[in-house]
C-alpha cells in the first residue's frame, strides 16, 4: 500500500512538473511563434503584374511582399491585405487578382515572423500596427493621392483595427472574423484545445510570459479599445458559426466602433474560414459594394 502511494505521489509530481513546463515554456512560445508557412505561388502565376516589396520596420526587420498592379488603364485605389496567424501573403493572391481586375491595386505581404518576412515573434498588432504604418509611408511616397484602405481577417483584422486607430492616412477598412481582446481570445483558444478545461489565471500567466519573450505588452492588444478611436468607414463581417472567434466579438466591435459609417454583416452558417463559401455571391457583392464606395 505504501509503495502504491509512493508511485501515485511520484506520478502526480511528474504531472505537476510537466504542467508547469507547459504553462511556463511551451504555451508562451506557441502564442508568439506560429509555424511559418509560404506557398510556391507568384503573382505572375495568376497573370498579375507586380513589383517586389521590401519594407523596413521601426525595429529594423524586413517585411517581404508584392505590390499588385491594376489590370485596368488607371488605378482607382490601393488596399493593404493583412493575413491571419500562421498565414502568408500568397493566401491573398486570388483576392488581389479580383481587386486588380477592378482597377484596384493591393499590397500583399508577410507579417513579421511569418512567411518570408524577418522577425522571430508575432505580437498580434502591438508592433504590427507600426509595421502597417511603415507600409503606408512606402505607399504614400509613390502614390500620395490614391485612396488607401486596409483589409484583414482573423489576427489580420485585429492588426488592421489597431492600425486604423493609429494611422489616419488609411481611409477605410474591411475587417473579417476578428477578436476583441488578446487575453480573452488566448483563453478561448486554450480552453477549446483542452476540450473545455481552462484556467483564466494560467492562460494569463502564459500570455504574460509570451509578452516578456516577445518584448510586448499583451494587455495593450485590445481591438475593442481601438475601435473607439476609429472614424474611418468600416465594413465588419463575421460568421455566426465561427468556431475560433465568437460572433459576439464581431458584434461587440461594431457596437463600440466610433465611426458613423459602419456596416456589420453576419454570414449565416459561416465558420472562421468559410465566409465566402457560405455567403456566396451575395456576400461578395456586399464586400465589393463597400469597396466601390471608397475608391475612385
Residue positions per predicted region:
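Conserved alpha/beta-hydrolase
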Residues: 98-118
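Alpha/beta-hydrolase active-site loop
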Residues: 91, 122-143
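Hydrolase active-site cap/lid region
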Residues: 162-216
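An N-terminal hydrophobic leader/cap segment in hydrolases
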Residues: 4-56, 66
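Short beta-strand/loop motif that positions the catalytic acidic residue
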Residues: 229-231, 236-238, 242
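Catalytic active-site module of serine/aspartate enzymes centered on a nucleophile-bearing elbow/loop
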Residues: 278-296
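Catalytic histidine-centered segment of alpha/beta-hydrolase-like enzymes
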Residues: 270-280
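The serine-hydrolase catalytic nucleophile loop
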Residues: 85-98, 111
